[in-house]
Amino acid sequence: MTNTSETTKTAIAHGNYVRGSASKVRRVLDQIRGRSYRDALIMLEFMPYRSTDPITKVLRSAVANAEHNYGMDPSTLIISSAWANNGPVMKRYRPRAQGRAFSIKKQTCHISISVESAPTQINAEVQN
């Protein structure tokens, strides 16, 4: 048996130990997943969330990896997958009244974005 499926090259970039919770980063990643590189950059520029800056940095790194490692054209790239996982939690303490202390959890996350070249659509016209 021969495998006739075409393999696509995928470039991945990771941003580790990014300050911010994974759930707030996922809110932005859900909006750009499946979009083209240029559309995603425009969306990230105008979103009012703090997590857009590190996401933009990771996205640009993924596109640079695609250009350098595989020679892909940035105008044809789409975001095939994007995810955020929980990172380590930094624990801090805030002094309170009567000798108490409340804990403050400063969350981090790991952002990963993979891009691949968009499938080219060939219009096969039947000529009579």
From Swiss-Prot:
Q: Name one GO molecular function term.
A: structural constituent of ribosome
* Superkingdom of this protein's organism: Bacteria
Instruction: Tell me the PROSITE patterns matching this sequence.
Output: RIBOSOMAL_L22 (PS00464)
* GO terms under cellular component: cytosolic large ribosomal subunit
Pfam families on file: Ribosomal_L22 (PF00237)
Keywords for this protein? Ribonucleoprotein, Ribosomal protein, RNA-binding, rRNA-binding
Q: Which InterPro entries match?
A: Ribosomal_uL22, Ribosomal_uL22_bac/chlpt-type, Ribosomal_uL22_bac/org-type, Ribosomal_uL22_CS, Ribosomal_uL22_sf
A single BP term in Gene Ontology: translation
Could you describe the subunit structure of this protein?
Part of the 50S ribosomal subunit.
Name the job this protein performs: This protein binds specifically to 23S rRNA; its binding is stimulated by other ribosomal proteins, e.g. L4, L17, and L20. It is important during the early stages of 50S assembly. It makes multiple contacts with different domains of the 23S rRNA in the assembled 50S subunit and ribosome. The globular domain of the protein is located near the polypeptide exit tunnel on the outside of the subunit, while an extended beta-hairpin is found that lines the wall of the exit tunnel in the center of the 70S ribosome.
PANTHER family referenced in this protein's UniProt entry, alphabetically: CHLOROPLAST 50S RIBOSOMAL PROTEIN L22-RELATED, LARGE RIBOSOMAL SUBUNIT PROTEIN UL22M
Question: What is stated as this protein's family in its record?
Answer: Belongs to the universal ribosomal protein uL22 family.
What is this protein identified as? Large ribosomal subunit protein uL22
Q: Which organism is it from?
A: Prochlorococcus marinus (strain MIT 9312)
Q: Lineage of the source organism?
A: Bacteria, Bacillati, Cyanobacteriota, Cyanophyceae, Synechococcales
